[in-house]
């Protein structure tokens, strides 16, 4: 048994119809700043999937520094979901787009990039790539992060991160379990509205916690944000 730690799981509760509306952008950015101020006493503050509603590279100058400042001042960490554009230094010189979780605060510069992408939403199957190029659908050409990503060191823990429905594929997550002390899922189920998707996804996370023998933390946009113990029991939950 290791040392206890404290984690703040932020549920942003942003409607999907407003999330990408530029008229609301400044409000969402300001609310994130307010959350990090309120949760600075926690060793780790976790935001949900794509909590930053624009590319990291397009954020206002100094925004990430302001976002991490309250936690960093106390030697604490922040993990936030974001869309990241990386230029791969390979012969093709293609841009790599990742649905990622990036670390800020005391241990910045760490990243987990989603590996199991959703076909037709996050990547184009080979025989349909022509259609996506024609339709110019945004964010449909994402790059997998790789299936051997190491746990992130955050809040005094080794955190095995997964994003959205990656936790439905236990065989793809199990490689990180021996090195980790906790599992962490970042999700945005606002796409599914008020449906069975939220309780179903929580049950999937419970199965992964029990299977791995590790606590599972869930930070979601509209629910269900939760702490699940290694026995698969939900000990704390937001609606």
Name each model-derived stretch.
Residues 1-239:
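Enzyme catalytic cores with a strong preference for nitrogen-chemistry domains
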């Amino acid at each position: 048994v290791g040392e206890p730690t404290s984690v703040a799981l932020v549920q942003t509760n942003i409607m999907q119809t407003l999330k990408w509306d530029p008229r609301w952008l400044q409000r969402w950015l300001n609310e994130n700043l307010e959350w990090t101020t309120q949760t600075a006493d926690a060793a780790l503050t976790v935001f949900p999937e794509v909590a930053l509603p624009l590319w990291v590279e397009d954020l206002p100058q100094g925004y990430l520094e302001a976002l991490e400042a309250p936690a960093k001042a106390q030697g604490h960490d922040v993990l936030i979901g974001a869309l990241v554009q990386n230029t791969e230094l390979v012969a093709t010189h293609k841009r790599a787009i990742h649905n990622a979780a990036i670390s800020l605060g005391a241990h910045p510069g760490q990243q987990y990039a989603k590996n199991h992408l959703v076909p037709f939403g996050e990547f184009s199957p080979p025989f349909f790539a022509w259609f996506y190029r024609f339709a110019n659908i945004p964010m449909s050409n994402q790059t997998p992060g790789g299936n051997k990503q190491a746990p992130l060191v955050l809040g005094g823990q080794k955190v095995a991160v997964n994003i959205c429905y990656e936790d439905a594929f236990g065989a793809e997550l199990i490689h990180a379990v021996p090195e980790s002390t906790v599992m962490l899922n970042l999700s945005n189920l606002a796409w599914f509205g008020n449906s069975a998707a939220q309780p179903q996804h929580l049950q999937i996370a419970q199965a992964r916690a029990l299977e791995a023998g590790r606590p599972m933390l869930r930070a979601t946009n509209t629910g269900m944000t939760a702490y699940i113990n290694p026995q698969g029991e939900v000990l704390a939950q937001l609606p």
